[in-house]
């Protein structure tokens, strides 16, 4: 089965290519922290030879509580992203929540992201597709892997085939997510690259009184399980002080653990992709 290659500048994203990393922080907490986090990611990924795209959100529009921190907003967020790109010369990805944001974000970011909760919103999907930008499509927690075909078709019908799929877990009762490893094989039938968002797969939605809980201690175990499935790469969030992060701290990797964490996953990715394909159907 031929696998499509999506090119982000000089980076090739495909299920049969070396793993890429879409990594950063959950939300832009401040300009200085964003610069600190990106600098560490760049240092580590350059050392390990992992192609890298910086990730953060300018607005978290689906927080549990009305009092939760959402981010700096569109205008200030784009200013921070522009400075990061100038300083570190890295591609950028961020999420879009409303149709009118799509074109603005696509002018600054190399990849625009369709949030999981919004992935069936046709007006948003079409607006994003019409920008011509690469789109990272998060699989909704309530969708089966095969249902992602409908979202891909919406984008294709709007004239955009620069698409990446991203697994982030499925709802399993209340306040819990699980990852069905069989889903990766189903989505590979669509031939687009697949990333694994290990951070949000560890989330426990609504698990705390006014925000999501998480299972940071299991991030390496779950990341290894995902990378073993011959994927295009990993989607990861890290934080200098996860216990005091403004969003999804319980899921975030400690920033000072980034190098040993990625070193193991790179080695695993190389091993898995060195094996010949065995057809078992």
UniProtKB/Swiss-Prot annotation:
An annotated GO cellular component: cytoplasm
Protein origin, superkingdom: Bacteria
Catalytic reactions of this protein: D-arabinose 5-phosphate + phosphoenolpyruvate + H2O = 3-deoxy-alpha-D-manno-2-octulosonate-8-phosphate + phosphate
A GO MF term: 3-deoxy-8-phosphooctulonate synthase activity
Pfam families reported for this sequence: DAHP_synth_1 (PF00793)
Entry's EC annotation: 2.5.1.55
Location of this chain's protein in the cell: Cytoplasm
UniProt pathway annotation: Carbohydrate biosynthesis; 3-deoxy-D-manno-octulosonate biosynthesis; 3-deoxy-D-manno-octulosonate from D-ribulose 5-phosphate: step 2/3; Bacterial outer membrane biogenesis; lipopolysaccharide biosynthesis
One GO-annotated biological process of the protein: keto-3-deoxy-D-manno-octulosonic acid biosynthetic process
Record keywords, A-Z: Cytoplasm, Lipopolysaccharide biosynthesis, Transferase
Transferase is among the record's keywords: yes
Family: Belongs to the KdsA family.
Stored HAMAP family: KDO8P_synth (MF_00056)
Protein name: 2-dehydro-3-deoxyphosphooctonate aldolase
């Amino acid at each position: 089965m031929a696998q499509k290659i999506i090119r982000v500048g000089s980076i090739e994203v495909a299920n049969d290519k070396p793993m890429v990393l879409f990594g950063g922080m959950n939300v832009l907490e401040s300009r200085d922290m964003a610069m600190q986090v990106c600098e560490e990611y760049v240092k580590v990924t350059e050392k390990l030879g992992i192609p890298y795209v910086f990730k953060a959100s300018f607005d978290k529009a689906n927080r549990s509580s009305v009092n939760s921190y959402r981010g700096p907003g569109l205008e200030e967020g784009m200013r921070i992203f522009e400075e990061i790109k100038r300083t570190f010369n890295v591609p950028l990805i961020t999420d879009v929540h409303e149709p009118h944001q799509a074109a603005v974000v696509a002018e600054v970011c190399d990849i625009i992201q369709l949030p999981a909760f919004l992935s069936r919103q046709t007006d948003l999907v079409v607006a994003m597709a019409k920008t011509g930008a690469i789109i990272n499509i998060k699989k909704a927690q309530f969708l089966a892997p095969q249902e992602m075909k409908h979202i891909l078709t919406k984008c294709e019908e709007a004239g955009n085939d620069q698409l990446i799929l991203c697994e982030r877990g499925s709802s399993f009762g209340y306040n819990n997510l699980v990852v069905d490893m069989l889903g990766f094989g189903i989505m590979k039938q669509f031939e687009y690259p697949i990333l694994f968002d290990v951070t949000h797969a560890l989330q426990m939605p609504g698990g705390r009184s006014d925000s999501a809980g998480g299972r940071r201690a299991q991030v390496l175990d779950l990341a290894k399980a995902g990378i073993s499935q011959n994927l295009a790469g990993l989607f990861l969030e890290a934080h200098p002080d996860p216990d005091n992060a403004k969003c999804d701290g319980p899921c975030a990797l400690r920033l000072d653990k980034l190098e040993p964490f990625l070193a193991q996953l790179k080695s695993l990715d190389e091993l898995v992709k060195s094996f010949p394909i065995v057809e078992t159907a």
